[in-house]
Amino acid sequence: MSGMLKAENVTVRYGARTVVQDLSFELKEGEWLMLVGPNGAGKSTLIEAIAGGVPYAGKLTLAGRNIRAFRASELARRIGVLAQKNAVSYAYSVEEVVSLGRYAHASDFLASRDDDGGERVERALELTGLTELRRASVLTLSGGELQRTFLAQVFAQNPQILILDEPANHLDLIYQKHIFSLIETWLRQPGRAVVSVVHDLSLARKYGTHAVLMHRGQCAAQGKIGDVMTAEKLQAVYEMDVYGWMREMLGQWA
């Protein structure tokens, strides 16, 4: 599998405070990299740096090319970002919101040529089960439907890499499973990869292929998901018996 995204000694500082320090990893085709760790570990800040949202030191390369060398429109064709919070204040239809994912592929703002945009939007609506809701106002959607709408938007964008910050945050269990299953289906196509911040360790373990375990802005462990998410490593970072706590919770339901 070929390398798609590479981080080398990435550091992010807010004033005198270092939030991410000397973090390196490589993302290859077909991989789903989970960024896990306690609150304040620097996970969301790291993906903001990858998406171009915050300045950083170090090097980020996309298919061997420095990310800083890409124009914003070029980068948007290659990387799709799903933020943790997606607020809406206008009564756009589901289809209109999903169609915004094609903006990066328009030749210019006024004469927006996008030859396969309609087909991409249709596929995204179908994949996320939103075809029947295409004309509904996004202001009328449930939390799960709204999150699927924004996921469909990045699917319509047709990027090579998805960057996701808590993609199932605040959703019921059934919607969490649905969102992660949709992403898993998207990932099966050639030339794709995913990086996501996930707090739910069970979801990270089930769907991830690889992980970076972060602690206080640094990498505590990285590699294949089963090698990283061990009882010993998780306990060292979370400062508690994570597996024991999970077993106790499940035992209460038995």
Residue ranges and their predicted role:
Residues 36-38:
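The feature captures the beta-strand-to-loop junction immediately N-terminal to the Walker
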Residues 58-66, 75:
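Conserved ABC transporter NBD signature motif
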Residues 162-166:
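Catalytic Walker B motif of ABC-type/P-loop ATPase nucleotide-binding domains
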Residues 216-217, 223:
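Conserved ABC ATPase "signature" C-loop
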Residues 51:
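Helix-to-loop junction immediately C-terminal to a conserved catalytic motif
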Residues 99, 114-133, 139:
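Conserved ABC ATPase "signature" region
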Residues 137-141, 145:
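Conserved ABC ATPase signature
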